[in-house]
Amino acid sequence: MTPAEIKRLYQIIKVQLEYGLDELLPDHQLTKAPLLMRKSLFWIKNKHPEKPLGERLRLALQELGPVWIKFGQMMSTRRDLFPPHIADPLALLQDQVAPFDGQLAKEQMELALGGPLQNWFTEFDIKPLASASIAQVHTARLKDTNQEVVLKVIRPDIRPVIDSDLKLMHRMASIVAGAMPEARRLKPVEVVREYEKTLLDELDLRREAANAIQLRRNFEGSEELYVPEVFPDFSNETVMVSERIYGIQVSDIEGLEANGTNMKLLAERGVSVFFTQVFRDSFFHADMHPGNVFVKPEHPENPMWIGLDCGIVGTLNSEDKRYLAENFLAFFNRDYRRVAELHVDSGWVPADTNVDEFEFAIRIVCEPIFAKPLCEISFGHVLLNLFNTARRFNMEVQPQLVLLQKTLLYVEGLGRQLYPQLDLWETAKPFLEEWMMNQVGPQALVNAIKDRAPFWAEKLPELPELLYDSLRQGKAMNQRMDQLYQGYRHSKRQQATGKFLFGVGATLVVCSAILVDNAYEQLSIASGIAGVTFWLLSWRAYRR
């Protein structure tokens, strides 16, 4: 380790001890030395003993800085690995840090765009509109159209910090996984690797721009969701320019009510937007926390969601979508056998899983949920219960389902915050049933033909030639089959002849032995020679 890494490691340990996070260390032979060092070398006491462990963990991560804040946010979504008293406080982590110098931000933008900002923008505000751990946002106007825009720029000093902390995270995860077998259940190495991929993706604003363009295209003309326009000509790896929007933050209940917003419709549209993204588009915004969701102030009787920050998205293939929809329908019909079979059929759990035991485990965990009215049942917790149960049956981590679960919890939480009586199942069931009908009914056949139409249009001119080749190959194959059949029949005849000759030869040899005993020497010799001759003929017949 370099001196800088050692210094950073000491800072991390110091903060952890100040918040008493050594309590997270299990009672293990290997943890005795660190606990002894805590008392003998560091002399650092827990400064917040009155706070719950989960809250202390949140405060410690917040103090350690942006990389650890985002790591905590990701941990809060992995409820299959972390218990509620840890995951719930981590969900409150706020990704807000002090802004860096606006002049430095301007220089970074000009370096990325290849010229002075006044070449393309006017009214650039040196004061940031918002600041987060990865990037900072400033406002301006497009010079050609006078349209208001926001310029998002990656922090210039963030990459070395991220690389350094990620190295430490990987080292610590490897040590924990190697030294404590019982800790491997939490999969520390895989968790850090997943986090690294997510974090590095957020450092490339081209990815976010592409995601926003795709999401905007998917909901073009929709009354439910609006995604601000991105200007790709001014966007690259470290800078992204998009349309500036004005809206009411979705968590501002008082502001929404003061504006006369139809809260019931707004909540139901949130559910509709989620299921449309998942089942129609197979492409969903996976970071829909309240800071990224606004509501248009115009037409409050017909409210529209606004989605920002498309850095994290999820995708599902057609098999995942079908199994997910069938799982929901089977669960709410209390068909636990079907739920178990679907997990096996989808490959989410091993093929040799005992379906009877799996069904029983699902029933024990999920049946108490139905003691509540349907309007009080949480979709997100349904998924959580299913995945946690499946984990006991060696279900592999499905990253796309983890993102889906996190997003569903966000959407469900926002929906019930807006309209506490929201019946998520009543809103979602018609959508799921219609989607399933489209997958297995006549419409599914029509859709499949439409999807394959370009392929067949391309192959149509080649069809006569392909048909001729198929007929020619079929004729050649028939001839070959005839030859093989004739050879087979000839072989069977030869085998029958060989068996007959062998039997005659054996009979003559036996007769030869009998004749010797009865003093018919010459006849015995002749019979023996004839028997051997028939054996040779039978061997020759087999050879053919």
Swiss-Prot record:
Pfam families: ABC1
A single cellular component GO annotation: plasma membrane
Residues that hold ATP according to the record: L129, A130, S131, A132, S133, I134, A135, Q136, V137, K152
EC number: 2.7.-.-
Active-site residue list: D287 (proton acceptor)
Biological process terms in GO annotation: regulation of ubiquinone biosynthetic process; ubiquinone biosynthetic process
Keyword Cell cycle among UniProt keywords: no
Chief place where the protein resides: membrane
Pathway given in the UniProt record: Cofactor biosynthesis; ubiquinone biosynthesis [regulation]
Record flagged with keyword Amino-acid biosynthesis: no
Top class in the EC scheme: transferase
InterPro entries hit by this protein: ABC1_dom (IPR004147), Kinase-like_dom_sf (IPR011009), UbiB (IPR010232), UbiB_bact (IPR045308), UbiB_kinase (IPR050154)
Domain called Protein kinase: residue spans: 123-501
GO molecular function annotation: ATP binding; protein kinase activity
Transmembrane segments annotated in the record for this chain: 496-516, 519-539
Family statement: Belongs to the ABC1 family. UbiB subfamily.
Name of the protein: Probable protein kinase UbiB
Phylogenetic placement of the source organism: Bacteria, Pseudomonadati, Pseudomonadota, Gammaproteobacteria, Vibrionales
Gene: ubiB
